[in-house]
């Protein structure tokens, strides 16, 4: 795919959505919508996504809009006006706002998408409201997610340190979780997999370890066994992650003081 600048993408997406709103039945509902571009952090995010958002009250007033009932029932759908360059997702504003308040991974990816979106049409200030909503963090849910990732990666590292025959899937899962937990700890965000490595690269811990993690990935893909220096990289990364966790939550959490926690697994942690 050809490289495209942010300005070019905004111009093309604005032109595309304007053309859509000249068509029946879209021309009758355009004044009630918010339209946003989900700006990609990587050129691999293709086709680009445009979200069209209506309030439930507006949808109820669209007596002749054929998609009305489906949007009200399911909360969102993909429009048949999508093209090879742009995919249109249509949302109920109320349902979308509700999705942002959930704590599962899909909702947290949605939060990331909203935070990184660009307003194309915003007749009712809904884009601003959604961005503000996406920044609100349920601290308990956030801690639970970090705890679950922390304990999962802790278990994998323990297996690696005690078993030279861990499979490739385990190492790949480890690197994915490293990137996930790094973003959660430094930026309180949960990027989609397509942009996860790119986002991890911008973190302080990412700048320190990304090249090393890619080195480990290359060894895995080439079928080589991990050497002691590779395991040392993993343990040093986990030590730094543990320090970030303690800096964020303190060392009073039960899951940080469990007998199987890193305080006990890594001999040089303290």
Predicted regions and their residues:
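Conserved NTP/Mg2+-binding pocket subregion across the NTase superfamily
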Residues: 2-14, 69-163, 263-269
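Conserved nucleotidyltransferase catalytic core and NTase-mimicking acidic/glycine-rich helix/loop elements
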Residues: 133-270
């Amino acid at each position: 795919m050809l490289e495209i600048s942010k300005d070019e993408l905004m111009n093309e997406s604005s032109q595309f959505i304007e053309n859509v709103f000249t068509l029946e039945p879209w021309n009758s509902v355009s004044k009630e919508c918010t339209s946003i571009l989900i700006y990609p952090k990587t050129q691999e995010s293709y086709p680009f996504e445009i979200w069209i958002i209506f309030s439930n009250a507006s949808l109820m007033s669209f007596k002749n809009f054929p998609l009305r009932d489906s949007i009200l029932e399911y909360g969102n759908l993909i429009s048949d006006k999508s093209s090879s360059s742009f995919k249109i997702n249509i949302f109920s504003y109320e349902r979308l706002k509700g999705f942002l308040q959930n704590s599962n991974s899909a909702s947290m990816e949605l939060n990331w998408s909203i935070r990184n979106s660009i307003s194309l049409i915003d007749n009712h200030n809904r884009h601003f409201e959604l961005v503000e909503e996406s920044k609100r963090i349920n601290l308990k849910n956030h801690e639970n997610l970090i705890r679950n990732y922390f304990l999962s990666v802790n278990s994998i590292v323990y297996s690696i340190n005690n078993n030279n025959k861990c499979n490739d899937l385990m190492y790949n899962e480890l690197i994915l979780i490293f990137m996930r937990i790094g973003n959660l700890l430094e930026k309180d965000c949960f990027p989609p997999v397509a942009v996860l490595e790119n986002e991890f690269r911008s973190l302080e811990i990412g700048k320190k370890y990304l090249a090393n993690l890619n080195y480990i990935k290359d060894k895995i893909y080439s079928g080589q066994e991990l050497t002691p220096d590779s395991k040392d990289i993993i343990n040093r990364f986990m030590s730094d992650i543990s320090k970030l966790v303690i800096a964020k939550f303190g060392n009073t959490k039960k899951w940080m003081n469990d007998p199987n926690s890193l305080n006990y697994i890594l001999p040089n942690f303290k």
